[in-house]
C-alpha cells in the first residue's frame, strides 16, 4: 500500500485535509512525513498537544471503522468552508430522510431505529458502509469507485500474495527485523500500526496526558465550529429547538439540518469514556512474540540496535586493489594472544598459497577434466581454451568423521592454535583475514587445498552473503595486467586463477545449490554470456552444465537401495479404527519414529546451524528444521510421561514404562537412533515420572537393567563422554542426538570472537565446520525402512498433558510416605 489509508464519507472522492495535505484522522503525527507534524511527533502547528487531541482521535473511531468526522457542509448549496479542515454530522450510516417539521424531535421519531442505520446508499454525503468509504478514500484522486471494483482489486492483491508464498526463493529472503525495515521504508504502515495498536504509542499518550489542558475552541484540528455543530445536532435530536435557535444567534452560526437517528455528541462521548478507560487494551495480542524480539525491534526502529549481520562490515574494496602484504594474520607457534595492531604482517598471500602442501584427501577425489587441447596447465603451457582439474567436492569419509567427533568437552580456540587435522594440514595457516584475502586463498594461483574450499563454502554465510561472494569471485576471475608484466605472463597467470575460480564456482553450485536465488542464477548466466563472447566456450559449458544439473536435481531424493526394506511388523487390527499405538510391536514403533525424525534431520541445512539462529528470536526463521526437530524431541519426551501417567494402577504404569524402555533400547542398539532414544529417556527422567518408585520396582529385572544401560550410555556426564564414544563406533545410517551439536556450536560461537583486529576469525569457522560437517555426514545415508501410514498417523497425534497436570497425577497415584500396600 503506497498511499495512507484515509477514510472519508464524501462522495466526490475528497479526503480529510489539513492545509491541503491528506490527514489520517486517527493519527497522532508520529509517523515520518506526517502533515500534522514534520519536526516533532507532538507539535501541532506550533501549538502544544493536549488531552483534547486524544479525545478528538477517539471521537473519530467507531466499531465499524468508519470516519465520523467528514468534511462539513456549511450551506444547502454544498459550499465548503476552507477554514475548517474536518467537518461533522455527515451521515456515514446511510441517509434515512429529512424531517419535514424541524420543530419535531428526531429522538421520538427514530427511537426504534437502529443506531447503525439501514445500510442503504445515502444521498449526498451518505455512505453505504465502511467498505465503500475505504474504497473511495483510497482512490480519491480518481473519484469514487464501486464496491465491485474494490473487491476485484483485493482479489488481485490476494493472488499476488499467493504467488509470493509459492515462490521457491521465498524462504531464502532475509526476514530478520522485517517489521523495522517495513516501517522505515513505508511510512504509511506506521500510520496503520498506530491506529490498530495504540499501545505502541505509550510515550505519546503519556506526554499528552501529562500536558496542560486547553479549550476545544483553540484546538487546531477540531476547532470551535465543529464542537458547536455537535451541540446543535444534539439539541435538534432532543427536540430543544428554542435552545438551538438561541445558540445559533449567540454563536452567529447556522445549523444545516441533517437527519440522524442518534445524538452524535452522546455517542461519541460514550466512545471516549469507554476507550479512555481501556486505551491500552486496544492492542493486538503479542504473546506470540518473544520479549527479546520485541525489545530488539523497538531499539532497531529507534536506530539504537545494530543487526549482527551488519556488524563489522567494512567498505567494499576490489579484490585486486587491496594491498598484498596486509589484512591477513597467520597462525604461528610463537604467536601472542594479543598481537600489536601497529605491527604489519609481512607475509604475502601468494607466498602462503604456494608454500603450503595440499590436503592428502585430494587423491581420493574424482576430477573432471575438459581437454580443449593437448597442452596441460600444470606444465605451464599457455592456452586460454584449456580447463584442467575442475575438481568436484566430495564429503569427508566416515572414518574422518569418526575421528573428528570429539570425545572431550569442546575447547575454545586460542590465538596460538593451528588449523590442522588428523590427515595433515587442512588449509592455509591463517587465523584471520579480510574477505578479499580469504577469497584469494580460496582461488590460489598454484596449489589448491580442497579442505579449505569445503570449510569456506560451508561457513561463508557466517561472515558474508552469497551475493557478495559471487561478486568477489567475478572480481577474481577478471585478472588485471600488472605494470611491467608481459602479455604471456599475464595470460598464464590469469588462466591459472580463472580455472580456480571456475572450479570453486562449480563446486559451490554442485554442493550448495540451495544458496542460489533467482537473482544469483541470473548473475551467473550473465557471467557465462560474457565468457562465451570472449571465446571461452568450454569454460562456460562446464559451469552451465553444473547449473542445469542443480536445477534438475533441486528438490529430488535420488537415494536408491539395493536391498529391500525389512517387512513391517504390523498388528492384525492395522485397518481397524480402534488401532492403539500400544498394540503395535516395540520394534515397529521404533522404526516409524526413526523414519519420521530422520526426515526432519535430513532436511537441516548447514546455514541453519550458523550464528546460533535456532536460539535467537530474530534469526529463528533461518532454522525451521532445527526448531522442528527440537519440537519433535520435546513432544516425544512429553508423550512418554503422559502415556505412563495415564494409568492409575502401578502394574499398568509399569507395563507402559517397560514398553518405552524397549523402544529406546531398540532405537539405540539396532537403529543407531540416539536422538529418539534420548527423547524417550528425557521423558522417563521427568520429575513426574522419575519419582514413581513403586512403578520402577514393578518392572522386570531385565527391563530395569536395560534402563540402567540407557542412563549410562546417554548420560550428559563429562560432556556426553560415553555417548560420543558410542557415536564414533556407530555405522550409518545414524541419527545422532542434535542437542550435543547445538551445545558444541554454542560453545564455539560464544567462546571465540567473530573478528580479530577487524579481520574475519577463520579459525573459529574451522571449529564450527567440524561440527556441521559431522551433521552433514550423517544426513547422507538414509534408513532403508518401510513407512506404515496407519502407525505413523498415530505417532503424529499425541495427546499431551501439561507439566503441572503430570505432577499432580504423579502425586495422586503415588503419594509421599505411602507403603506399596496402600497404592493401587
Curated annotation (Swiss-Prot):
Do the record's keywords include Secreted?
no
Residue ranges with Basic and acidic residues bias = 331-341
The GO terms describing molecular function are: guanyl-nucleotide exchange factor activity
Q: Write down the superkingdom of origin.
A: Eukaryota
One GO biological-process annotation of the entry reads: Ras protein signal transduction
Q: Which InterPro entries match?
A: LisH, Ras-like_GEF, Ras-like_Gua-exchang_fac_N, Ras_GEF_dom_sf, RASGEF_cat_dom, RASGEF_cat_dom_sf
Q: Which UniProt keywords apply?
A: Guanine-nucleotide releasing factor
SMART domains attached here? RasGEF, RasGEFN
Region (Disordered) residue spans: 1-51, 65-167, 330-354, 398-425
Stored Pfam families:
RasGEF, RasGEF_N
Q: From start to end residue, where is composition biased (Polar residues)? A: 83-95, 413-425
Domain called N-terminal Ras-GEF: residue spans = 426-551
Domain named LisH is located at 223-255
Q: Which Gene3D superfamilies match?
A: Ras guanine-nucleotide exchange factors catalytic domain, Son of sevenless (SoS) protein Chain: S domain 1
Q: Where is the composition biased (Low complexity)?
A: 8-41, 104-116, 136-167, 343-354
Q: Does the keyword Mitochondrion apply?
A: no
Question: What is its induction?
Answer: Up-regulated by Pseudomonas aeruginosa, PAO1 strain and PA14 strain infection and down-regulated by phagocytic stimuli.
PROSITE patterns tied to this protein: LISH, RASGEF_CAT, RASGEF_NTER
Could you tell me where the Gly residues compositional bias lies? Answer: 117-128
Q: Where is the Ras-GEF domain?
A: 585-816
PANTHER family noted in UniProt: GUANINE NUCLEOTIDE EXCHANGE FACTOR (PTHR23113), RAS GUANINE NUCLEOTIDE EXCHANGE FACTOR I-RELATED (PTHR23113:SF351)
Q: What does this protein do?
A: Promotes the exchange of Ras-bound GDP by GTP.
Spell out the protein name for this chain: Ras guanine nucleotide exchange factor I
Q: Which organism is it from?
A: Dictyostelium discoideum (Social amoeba)
Q: What is the lineage of its organism?
A: Eukaryota, Amoebozoa, Evosea, Eumycetozoa, Dictyostelia
Gene designation per UniProt? gefI
Amino acid at each position: 500500500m503506497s498511499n495512507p489509508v484515509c477514510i472519508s464519507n464524501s462522495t466526490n472522492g475528497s479526503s480529510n485535509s489539513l492545509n491541503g495535505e491528506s490527514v489520517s484522522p486517527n493519527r497522532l503525527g508520529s509517523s515520518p512525513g506526517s502533515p500534522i507534524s514534520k519536526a516533532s511527533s507532538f507539535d501541532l502547528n506550533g501549538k502544544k498537544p493536549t488531552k483534547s487531541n486524544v479525545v478528538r482521535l477517539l471521537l473519530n473511531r467507531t466499531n465499524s471503522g468508519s470516519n465520523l468526522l467528514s468534511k462539513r457542509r456549511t450551506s444547502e448549496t454544498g459550499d465548503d468552508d476552507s477554514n475548517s479542515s474536518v467537518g461533522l454530522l455527515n451521515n456515514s450510516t446511510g441517509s434515512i430522510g429529512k424531517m419535514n417539521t424541524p420543530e419535531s424531535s428526531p429522538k421520538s421519531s427514530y427511537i426504534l431505529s437502529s443506531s447503525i442505520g439501514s445500510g442503504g446508499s445515502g444521498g449526498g454525503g451518505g455512505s453505504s458502509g465502511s467498505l465503500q468509504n475505504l474504497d473511495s478514500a483510497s482512490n480519491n484522486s480518481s473519484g469514487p469507485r464501486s464496491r465491485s471494483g474494490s473487491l476485484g482489486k483485493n482479489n488481485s492483491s490476494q493472488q499476488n500474495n499467493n504467488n509470493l508464498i509459492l515462490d521457491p526463493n521465498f524462504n531464502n529472503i532475509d526476514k530478520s527485523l522485517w517489521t523495522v525495515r517495513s516501517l522505515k521504508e513505508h511510512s504509511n504502515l506506521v500510520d496503520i500500526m498506530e491506529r490498530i495498536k495504540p499501545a505502541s504509542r505509550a510515550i505519546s499518550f503519556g506526554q499528552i496526558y501529562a500536558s496542560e489542558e486547553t479549550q476545544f475552541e483553540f484546538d487546531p484540528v477540531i476547532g470551535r465550529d465543529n464542537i458547536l455543530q455537535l451541540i446543535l445536532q444534539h439539541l435538534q435530536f432532543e427536540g430543544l429547538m428554542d435552545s438551538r435557535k438561541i445558540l445559533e444567534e449567540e454563536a452567529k452560526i447556522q445549523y444545516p439540518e441533517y437527519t440522524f437517528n442518534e445524538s452524535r455528541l452522546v455517542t461519541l462521548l460514550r466512545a471516549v469514556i469507554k476507550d479512555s478507560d481501556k486505551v491500552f487494551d486496544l492492542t493486538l495480542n503479542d504473546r506470540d512474540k518473544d520479549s527479546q524480539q520485541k525489545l530488539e525491534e523497538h531499539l532497531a526502529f529507534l536506530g539504537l540496535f545494530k543487526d549482527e549481520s551488519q556488524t563489522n562490515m567494512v567498505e567494499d574494496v576490489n579484490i585486486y586493489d587491496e594491498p598484498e602484504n596486509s589484512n591477513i594474520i597467520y597462525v604461528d607457534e610463537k604467536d601472542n594472544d594479543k598481537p600489536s595492531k601497529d605491527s604489519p604482517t609481512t607475509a604475502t598471500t601468494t607466498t602462503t598459497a604456494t608454500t603450503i602442501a595440499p590436503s592428502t584427501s585430494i587423491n581420493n577425489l574424482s576430477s573432471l577434466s575438459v581437454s580443449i587441447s593437448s597442452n596441460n596447465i600444470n606444465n605451464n603451457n599457455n592456452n586460454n581454451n584449456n580447463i584442467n582439474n575442475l575438481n568436484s567436492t566430495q564429503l569427508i569419509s566416515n572414518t574422518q568423521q569418526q575421528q573428528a567427533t570429539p570425545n572431550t568437552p569442546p575447547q575454545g580456540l586460542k590465538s596460538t592454535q593451528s588449523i590442522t587435522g588428523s590427515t595433515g594440514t587442512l588449509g592455509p595457516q591463517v587465523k584471520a583475514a579480510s574477505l578479499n584475502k580469504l577469497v584469494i586463498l580460496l582461488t590460489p594461483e598454484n596449489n589448491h587445498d580442497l579442505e579449505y574450499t569445503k570449510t569456506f563454502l560451508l561457513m561463508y554465510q557466517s561472515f558474508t552473503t552469497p551475493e557478495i561472494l559471487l561478486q568477489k569471485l567475478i572480481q577474481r576471475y577478471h585478472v588485471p595486467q600488472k605494470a611491467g608484466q608481459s602479455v604471456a605472463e599475464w595470460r598464464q597467470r590469469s588462466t591459472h586463477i580463472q580455472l580456480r575460480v571456475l572450479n570453486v564456482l562449480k563446486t559451490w553450485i554442485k554442493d550448495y545449490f540451495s544458496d542460489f536465488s533467482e537473482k544469483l542464477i541470473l548473475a551467473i548466466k550473465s557471467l557465462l554470456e560474457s565468457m562465451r563472447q570472449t571465446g571461452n566456450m568450454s569454460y562456460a559449458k562446464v559451469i552451465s552444465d553444473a547449473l542445469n544439473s542443480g536445477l534438475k536435481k533441486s528438490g529430488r531424493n535420488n537415494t536408491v537401495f539395493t536391498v529391500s526394506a525389512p517387512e513391517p511388523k504390523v498388528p492384525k487390527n492395522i485397518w481397524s479404527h480402534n488401532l492403539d499405538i500400544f498394540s503395535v510391536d516395540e520394534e515397529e514403533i521404533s522404526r516409524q519414529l526413526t523414519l519420521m525424525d530422520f526426515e526432519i534431520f535430513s532436511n537441516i541445512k548447514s546455514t541453519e546451524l550458523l550464528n546460533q539462529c535456532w536460539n535467537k528470536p530474530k534469526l529463528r526463521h533461518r532454522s525451521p528444521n532445527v526448531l522442528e526437530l527440537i519440537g519433535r524431541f520435546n513432544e516425544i519426551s512429553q508423550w512418554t510421561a503422559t502415556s505412563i501417567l495415564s494409568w492409575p494402577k502401578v502394574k499398568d504404569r509399569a507395563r507402559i514404562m517397560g514398553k518405552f524402555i524397549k523402544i529406546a533400547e531398540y532405537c539405540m542398539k539396532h537403529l543407531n537412533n540416539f536422538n529418539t532414544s534420548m527423547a524417550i529417556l528425557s521423558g522417563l527422567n521427568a520429575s513426574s515420572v522419575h519419582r514413581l518408585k513403586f512403578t520402577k520396582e514393578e518392572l522386570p529385572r531385565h527391563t530395569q537393567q536395560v534402563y540402567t544401560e540407557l542412563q549410562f550410555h546417554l548420560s550428559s556426564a563429562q560432556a556426553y563422554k560415553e555417548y560420543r564414544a558410542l557415536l564414533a563406533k556407530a555405522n550409518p545410517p545414524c541419527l545422532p542426538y542434535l542437542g550435543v551439536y547445538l551445545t558444541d556450536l554454542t560453545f564455539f560461537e560464544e567462546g571465540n570472537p567473530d573478528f580479530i583486529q577487524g579481520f574475519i576469525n577463520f579459525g573459529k569457522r574451522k571449529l564450527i565446520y567440524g561440527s556441521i560437517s559431522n551433521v552433514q555426514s550423517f544426513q547422507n545415508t538414509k534408513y532403508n525402512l518401510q513407512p506404515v501410514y496407519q502407525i505413523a498417523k498415530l505417532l503424529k497425534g499425541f495427546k499431551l498433558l501439561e507439566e503441572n497436570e503430570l505432577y499432580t497425577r504423579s502425586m495422586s497415584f503415588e503419594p509421599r510416605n505411602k507403603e506399596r500396600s496402600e497404592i493401587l
